[in-house]
UniProtKB/Swiss-Prot annotation:
Binding site for a divalent metal cation: 11, 13, 49
Gene transcribed to yield this protein: ispF
Protein name: 2-C-methyl-D-erythritol 2,4-cyclodiphosphate synthase
Cofactors named for this entry: a divalent metal cation
Catalytic activity: 4-CDP-2-C-methyl-D-erythritol 2-phosphate = 2-C-methyl-D-erythritol 2,4-cyclic diphosphate + CMP
């Protein structure tokens, strides 16, 4: 019997004006121009935070808040790609690899389609897999709720982990 593991993660961050002339959000490690930045202890990358939580959840290893607490000054402004690679190291150490990841970002703006391939490529690189195993898509909430009012952004990630047959 093959022991697959499935995990799900969600992350939300509020938009805010950081006082800088150039505002942007970082999603899947890609800086995207926007009218606001994201309020967060780290870089606020909801895509990678949701993905990391999904990976941890698949193995019952807690959540990113336990591994990277916002009370630790060392995590201030942390690049979420560093966080994701750390989490994936735990996946590999447990004897698993990523089968695939499916990520949905919910926001009215910014529009993400022009950045889709770059986001997928970053994730595939960090998780040592082919880009065809990574899905990133965006949807609006039809102007409903906090994302509809453009108060923040949300991401949901689902992952499938499979045993690492190569033993690498």
């Amino acid at each position: 019997m093959i022991m697959i593991k499935i995990g799900q993660g969600i992350d939300v961050h509020a938009f805010h004006n950081n006082g800088q002339q150039q505002q942007y959000v970082v999603l899947a490690g890609v800086p995207i121009d926007h009218t606001h930045s994201l309020l967060a202890h780290s870089d606020g990358d909801v895509v990678l935070h949701a993905l990391a939580d999904a990976l941890l959840g698949a193995l019952a290893l807690g959540d990113i808040g336990q591994h990277f607490p916002d009370t630790d000054a060392a995590n201030a402004g942390l690049d979420s790609r560093v966080l994701l690679r750390y989490v994936y190291g735990k996946v590999l150490a447990a004897g698993y690899i990523l089968g695939n990841a499916d990520i949905t970002v919910m926001c009215e703006r910014p529009k993400l389609a022009p950045h889709n391939l770059a986001m997928r490529a970053n994730i595939a690189s960090d998780l040592q897999t082919d880009v065809s195993n990574i899905s990133v898509k965006a949807t609006t909430t039809e102007k409903l709720g906090f994302t509809g009012r453009q108060e923040g952004i949300m991401a949901n990630a689902v992952v499938l982990l499979v045993p690492n047959a190569s033993g690498v």
